[in-house]
Amino acid sequence: MGFKCGIVGLPNVGKSTLFNALTKSSIPAENFPFCTIEPNVGKVPLPDNRLKKLNDIVNSKKIIPASLDLVDIAGLVKGASQGEGLGNAFLSNIREMNALAHVVRCFEDENITHVDGSIDPVRDAEIINLELIMSDLETVSKRILKCEKLLKTNDKKNKAEHEILIKIKNDLDQGKLINIEGFNEDERTIIKNFQLLSSKPTFYIANISDDGSSDDALNKLIEFANISGNTVIPTSIKIEQEIAILDEEERKEYLELMDMDEPVLNKIIFKGYELLGLQTYFTAGPQEIRAWTIKNNSTAPNAAGVIHTDFERGFIKAEVISFEDYISCNGESGSKEKGKLRLEGKEYIVKDGDVIHFKFNV
């Protein structure tokens, strides 16, 4: 469906290394600023244990997980909104993202340069945020001038847009990121048309050392993120990359040794999925079991359209079994026998984990 999560941050904080670990790629990750110029794009499979449980029952020939598009974006520097560094290109790339994973360096290492010469995660996070705010201020100010020229026409749509823009500008002037949750549904629809950088759903990835020496810096970043209600996921990106290249058996042994249930990378992928407002439904048959990605609160026809537009256009009904019922009843036949298979129409809101078979006619 093309939902994109951008990896952003200052140069040399671990963005490209994280991208490599998540996508199992080998793009350059060098010890100098702007190693990444053009954004790198990769698909990341969503780890989902439910697929294995479904396959234990169905024994399908193929298993296809859901995926997330990750984009490694060039490092930002102070003054990017005025064109410094790769500023204009960087900001343009961010505008295309649906959510942001903001990597912040929290570890000391004299062998890895820092663009500002010292480790200060709050300062670094604020640099990125300020550049997004400054870019949005320019966008909003131009839009306000355009609206003001039309105010005399008493156009209701223009007036509503002007009022929202003034509200947004006041927040930006105070150095605040735009929290779209603070607006009603109609206002959000208008705001989305502005493509504001500072309104992108964001979480922080704290790149820490593996010896506990990053604790102070990490705590400062968490305290800073809590103010705006953002999540911080701490991890040693270097170690995560080492885990990512292990085969399945070696990875399992390593995680057991480290007393970890799963790689932290999985949490990062799920957080991106969550921020994008996505969920999964399944189709299951002898040829393939597949996880499909849809927006939260999608109707059954919307969900069918992800498979093929004909499915949505000619939608008749959906045969739905919840994941829990499918497993407890040992598949479709058992679910039918126990009355757990439901016929749903066009108004049905698909739930995460639903196992669905669509009926359509075109």
Segments from the language model and where they lie:
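Flexible beta-alpha connector loops of hexameric P-loop NTPases
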Residues: 76-81, 117-119, 123-132, 151-157, ...
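Switch/coupling subdomain of P-loop NTPase systems
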Residues: 95, 99-100, 107-135, 139-142, ...
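Short, flexible surface segments
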Residues: 96, 351-352
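Amphipathic, soluble alpha-helical interaction motifs
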Residues: 57, 100-103, 131, 143, ...
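Conserved nucleotide-binding/hydrolysis micro-motifs of P-loop NTPases
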Residues: 24-25, 50-51, 75-77, 105-111, ...
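Conserved G1/Walker A P-loop phosphate-binding module
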Residues: 1-113, 122, 141, 147
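C-terminal-of-GTPase-core extension/linker across diverse P-loop GTPases
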Residues: 2-8, 13, 19, 146-349, ...
